[in-house]
Amino acid sequence: MGKSKKQKEEMLAGIKQNLSESQLALVINYQGLSVAEITDLRRRLIPTGSICSIAKNTLMGIAVKEDSNWQPMEDLLAGSNAFLFLKNDIGGAIKAYQDFQKATKKTEFKGGVMEGRLLDKDQVKAIADLPSKEELLAQVAGAINNIATKLAISLDAVPTQLATGINEVPASVNRAIKAISDKEQQGDAA
């Protein structure tokens, strides 16, 4: 028995909600996966804040047609598709899918869409290899901390060098007076 119009409208609203919250959407062919395997994929995606959803291509087509950021996905809507909505940890979600794909060897990656662009397998893999947001923040914080440490060491050295210079002035004046005095004595003796 088919779904009622109201059920389809609710599913469409859910798809649109997932798209609006996602940074990247992947399309995979899930033909041959068991319910347990799809559940396993969904569990792997949970820690990354991502979702695996199975929807009819016609419903997904309606959802993406209304949003220019997702329109390129229309080219991928054929066959038995599962949709991965990647929201927070994109790299972690892609790696979770890749690990799942290696374990099952049953899914086929069809493509992805990000910021209105259709992405192939290599482009998605390149995104997965980027550091996570937390790693980037840690790198920036480390760089700022390193600069602050070097600045503190440099500023600490300035008073020391200034004190050495101030102490050297009287000694230099003393040497200059002595040299002048010695020169005058040599001039008197001659």
UniProtKB/Swiss-Prot annotation:
Family: Belongs to the universal ribosomal protein uL10 family.
Origin superkingdom: Bacteria
Gene Ontology CC: one annotated term: large ribosomal subunit
Protein name: Large ribosomal subunit protein uL10
Biological process terms in GO annotation: translation
Listed GO MF terms: large ribosomal subunit rRNA binding; structural constituent of ribosome
Function: Forms part of the ribosomal stalk, playing a central role in the interaction of the ribosome with GTP-bound translation factors.
Transmembrane segments: none
Subunit structure: Part of the ribosomal stalk of the 50S ribosomal subunit. The N-terminus interacts with L11 and the large rRNA to form the base of the stalk. The C-terminus forms an elongated spine to which L12 dimers bind in a sequential fashion forming a multimeric L10(L12)X complex.
Short name of any one Pfam family annotated for the protein: Ribosomal_L10
Ribonucleoprotein recorded as keyword: yes
Keywords from the UniProt entry: Ribonucleoprotein, Ribosomal protein, RNA-binding, rRNA-binding
InterPro entries referenced in this protein's UniProt entry, alphabetically: Ribosomal_uL10, Ribosomal_uL10-like_sf, Ribosomal_uL10_bac, Ribosomal_uL10_bac_type, Ribosomal_uL10_CS_bac
